[in-house]
Swiss-Prot record:
GO CC field: cytoplasm; excinuclease repair complex
Gene this chain is encoded by: uvrC
Record key words, sorted: Cytoplasm, DNA damage, DNA excision, DNA repair, Excision nuclease, SOS response
The keyword Electron transport belongs to this UniProt entry's keyword annotation: no
Database matches in SMART domains: GIYc, HhH1
Species name: Trichodesmium erythraeum (strain IMS101)
Protein name (Swiss-Prot/TrEMBL): UvrABC system protein C
Length: 622
């Protein structure tokens, strides 16, 4: 006999006993339902008081929290030593479990970050849309709303400061043109020490920390010292850096009253699905950064002001956990009251080592600032909504064209690329809800021995790829299974794929079509004639975007493979030089041309290449 577990609010004795077990210390609490699913994860400075507040009679809960309380059957807790530890643990657990009733920040690729790879001796600085958390020392700034402004800023920064320009050196034994024109300090040849280079990068980091004014003051002092020491060339170089930074400062979009207070202003706009949150970073009256976040929360369309404050609190906690103390402002202006404002304020004050204030503005100037941030959030929400509407329209149209039972949530596109059979490859690209999902893209090397230089077979190649893709179809999760696959080609390619899918007994589960290039004709399995469609229909345009992306991805991989083969082709003619040693030589010299110019002694220095083979290689080229 299975005893049904009642919600804890219907068993007052069990509830009271459980509450007594919870200590009055900092920590994290987890609410679970009868299926042992985590409903909500929260934190508190005083665990017992916080958890008890959910069950207090007369407590004015929001609709979301009221729904949650009705489902709670168990409460767990984890004690921490400090509030800061509770904050960090809560963030990690929410990210791991994604509880339904928590505010969830989407790991969105719409907004880019700027990354500084402090984990490397000579850090790189680049723009990325993916926060890689594998290396703890690396630092990410963002996510930035204005991608163009970020790119322009980085471009100007690289003109002002001599920085590493390439992920890998272009030459082994000499510096490239960037060094000759002063754009790079000669990192590849170690013409600058890691310590000296770090000093340059630390100054660049100050720009993205919103400390450009502070950096200009430092450079002014340094310029005066160099001038006093009669180092006029260095002084002139620093002067040019200051001019560049001043022009960067002048390009800021919004100027506010020129006080010396550092402040952040945060506001949001939401619909029934998502909330767009914008955070303006203002330093010395200048808007130095505009960050964007996407949040999800149940019943957002009917959210009250209290719920809006919950979203703002979640964003601020997530953001300030990953920034350095110098980036924390002394003022944080918020659109709505935060539910745990004191908790966040105390933690930020402790982290910064200086008092931090969080408040809803009452005076006209700061209230207008929040209104401006809110309007920007509304514009961004409208932009995303229009994009979503266009994609939904395209998926709806495509479902009607192909007579699909549901909208195609996941669509996969396949293409083949080769030159007369040589270096034959295939690509798979994936669109989810009408947008590219690049984390699911795949390359395939064609393994069919019949496909080789001078002997191409697109039908067999496509059949091979589809067979490999769906080899373990039954073991795949629902989210990995496509609603529709599109083959780049005509009736021939489609027939080859259909034969494979019938053999694998999946043709009834996965819809497949092909899209021919010349007339943008859509072919269905078993049909000799293409569908009658208009090339300008939204659904057809979606298939075209998918086809073009699959083609681009396949061609780029084919070119890479062909380039690698051409590099190795001359080395293949040298007796005794196998693939492994070819890789060692190319890894050491980076190109066949440099191998050709190397002396016997230089060739012999390569691991696995002795004096005898080095002489053979030298003799071959000479």
């Amino acid at each position: 006999m299975i005893t049904q577990i009642l919600p804890i609010i219907k068993d007052s004795e069990r509830l009271e006993n459980r509450l007594k077990e919870i200590p009055q210390t900092p920590g994290v609490y987890l609410m679970r339902d009868r299926s042992d699913r985590i409903l909500y994860i929260g934190k508190s400075k005083k665990l017992r008081n916080r958890v008890r507040s959910y069950f207090r009679d007369g407590k004015n809960h929001t609709h979301r929290i009221s729904l949650m309380i009705q489902q709670i059957v168990e409460i767990e807790f984890i004690v921490t030593d400090t509030e800061a530890e509770a904050l960090a643990l809560e963030a990690n657990l929410v990210k791991q479990h994604q509880p339904y009733f928590n505010v969830l920040l989407k790991d969105d690729k719409k907004y880019p970050y700027l990354c500084i790879t402090w984990s490397e001796d000579y850090p790189r600085i680049f723009i990325t849309r993916k926060r890689r958390l594998g290396k703890a020392k690396d630092r990410y700034y963002g996510p930035y709303v204005d991608t163009r402004l970020l790119r322009n800023t980085l471009h100007l920064v690289k003109r002002i400061f001599p920085l590493r320009q390439r992920p890998k050196p272009l030459f082994k034994d000499r510096s490239c043109l960037n060094y000759d024109i002063g754009r790079c300090p000669g990192v590849c040849q170690e013409l600058i020490t890691p310590e000296e280079y770090h000093k340059i990068v630390q100054r660049v980091a100050m720009i993205f920390q919103g400390r450009t004014g502070e950096l200009i003051d430092i450079l002014n002092t340094q310029m005066e010292k160099e001038a006093e020491a009669l180092n006029f060339e260095k002084a002139a170089f620093i002067r040019d850096q200051i001019r560049g930074l001043n022009s960067l400062n002048a390009d800021q979009k919004v100027s506010l009253p020129d006080d010396r207070v550092s402040r952040d202003a945060i506001a949001l706009a939401g619909n029934h699905q998502i909330a767009c949150v914008q955070l303006f970073q203002i330093r010395a009256g200048k808007l130095v950064g505009r960050l964007g976040f996407i949040a999800e929360i149940p019943d957002l369309g009917t959210a009250e002001n209290q719920e809006l404050g919950v979203i703002l609190q979640r964003v601020l906690e997530s953001h300030y956990q990953i920034v350095e103390s110098v980036e924390i402002p002394t003022e944080i202006i918020v659109q709505n009251e935060l539910p745990e404002s004191n908790f966040l304020q105390n933690w930020l004050t402790e982290k910064k080592g200086k008092k931090v204030e969080i408040f809803v503005p009452q005076r006209q100037g700061k209230a207008e600032l929040i209104e401006m941030v809110k309007k920007n959030a509304e514009y961004e929400l409208l932009r995303l909504a229009k994009m979503s509407d266009r994609n939904n329209e395209a998926m709806t149209d495509l479902a009607e064209i192909l007579d699909l039972p549901e909208l195609p949530h996941r669509i996969e596109g396949y293409d083949i690329s080769h030159i007369q059979g040589s270096d034959a490859v295939a690509s798979r690209v994936v669109f989810i809800d009408g947008l590219p999902a690049k984390q699911h893209y795949r390359h395939y090397k064609i393994k069919n021995p019949e496909v080789r230089s001078g002997h191409s077979d697109d039908f067999a190649s496509m059949a091979e790829v589809i067979g490999r893709r769906f080899r373990d179809y039954e073991k795949q999760t629902t989210t990995d299974k496509p609603d529709l696959i599109m083959i780049d080609g005509g009736k021939g390619q489609l027939s080859a794929v259909v034969a494979v899918m019938e053999e694998m007994n999946i043709l009834e589960e996965v819809r497949v079509v092909s899209l021919a290039k010349q007339r943008e004709e859509i072919f269905l399995p078993g049909e000799s004639e293409p569908l009658r469609t208009d090339a300008e229909q939204p659904g057809v345009q979606l298939l075209r975007r998918l086809r073009d992306e699959a083609h681009r991805f396949a061609v780029s991989f084919h070119r890479d493979r062909r380039s690698q083969r051409m590099k190795r082709s001359r080395l293949d003619e040298i007796p005794g030089l196998g693939q492994h040693r070819q890789k060692l030589l190319l890894g050491h010299f980076h190109s066949v041309d440099y191998i050709r110019m190397a002396t016997v002694e230089q060739l012999a220095e390569v691991s696995g290449v002795g004096p005898k083979l080095a002489q053979q290689i030298y003799d071959y080229f000479h």
